[in-house]
């Protein structure tokens, strides 16, 4: 299931689009305020960001520009402003698309799916190149299997549903099994940005991943916390 953060201050529009996308296997978090959008996006680390332009606190163009320096996923502007100048500005700010709210829902869905597919393929290709894996090599740790081509994770013969962001985090940890990965390394490898000492999105994502992989929340033994250093994927904890 793909995850989306939709920054939209019109509650009716946000609800309608979120409900439509949910019917098509997309999990949508609606954030109504522009000045809280960046915090929500970095915390949720979604597969795609959908942005309105006219927002309270901070406009969508500025959010797009500021976010692009910290987050590498697809950003799509969804707006009622039918202006060539705004369209051009959005692309220059780092958006991958500019879609009008009058666009039929089915067309919106198709375009979002296109950007999600393109991002997944680009991320997978980058990961395979960096780890020098053959195209068909899955990783196996006891009862855990991670298939990078089909992007499928199974634990004790049960498929685990992971978002693209969660899969990439698991893949990054698993390909460095037994090694301590600090927040800076994880952020650089996954998003291309440095850790600023305040960003807690990695901690939130690790917590979410542990829950899905049935790790012990109180005393994690599969994805361990190494105090003041980072996180360690334990290769022998998956029996």
UniProtKB/Swiss-Prot annotation:
Phosphorylated by RstB. GO terms for molecular function: phosphorelay response regulator activity; transcription cis-regulatory region binding. GO terms for cellular component: cytosol; protein-DNA complex. The keyword Transcription regulation applies. Residues 3-116 form the Response regulatory domain. GO terms for biological process: regulation of DNA-templated transcription. It is found in: Cytoplasm. Its main location: cytoplasm. The keyword Metal-binding does not apply. Keywords: Cytoplasm, DNA-binding, Phosphoprotein, Transcription, Transcription regulation, Two-component regulatory system. Residues 136-235 bind DNA. Gene3D superfamilies: 3.40.50.2300, Winged helix-like DNA-binding domain superfamily/Winged helix DNA-binding domain. The modification 4-aspartylphosphate is found at residue 52. Member of the two-component regulatory system RstB/RstA. This is Transcriptional regulatory protein RstA.
